[in-house]
Amino acid sequence: MQKTCMGVINRKIDQDIFGELATSTVNLGAAVTSNTLRVLRGKTVLGNNDVPWDGNITFVLTPATEAFMMGENDFSSRDFTMNGPFDYADPAWKDRPIVYRWLGMNWIVHPNLNGGGGPASATEETYMFHKSAIGHAFNADDLEAKAGYDEEQDYSWARCSIYMGSQLLQGSGVVIIAHDGSSLAAA
């Protein structure tokens, strides 16, 4: 139960960070389907904003964005990446997002990233950012993860509490790349 409770905390941390990334004013415009050129455009915008290309760039994307990128030979081929999307056996069974490494960036596919439009919608937002552009802090000393059993009432319980916060530190270090994933929505 404590593990499940901490999973809830971790998802809340993700949502806080995504909420701050969404406040960036740098974007690539209207939502279209993703491809290699669009990703390279985002990378170029970061470079033009003097963001250091030091291995600390992350691209957080939706499952629909990943699906479109899998159709790009540059992304899915072993010839172009050291840590590609097919390097992990059965990633769906892991309780954390899988990290790919491509174009000098960490790629994280996150199922709860949608920019408010819902999964596989025409308004998905993905974020390309430098590590120093976003901050997240929590009070580790006050983190509580407790579980127990009440014999009198015959029920189990779990509770986690944490004091935390996220903040966009450098707006120019984040690029919002809107993606149209509507063609992959369930019928």
Give the location of each predicted region.
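Sequence/fold signature of self-assembling virion shell proteins
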Residues: 72-187
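Extended, solvent-exposed, turn-rich assembly/linker loops in the middle of proteins
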Residues: 21-97
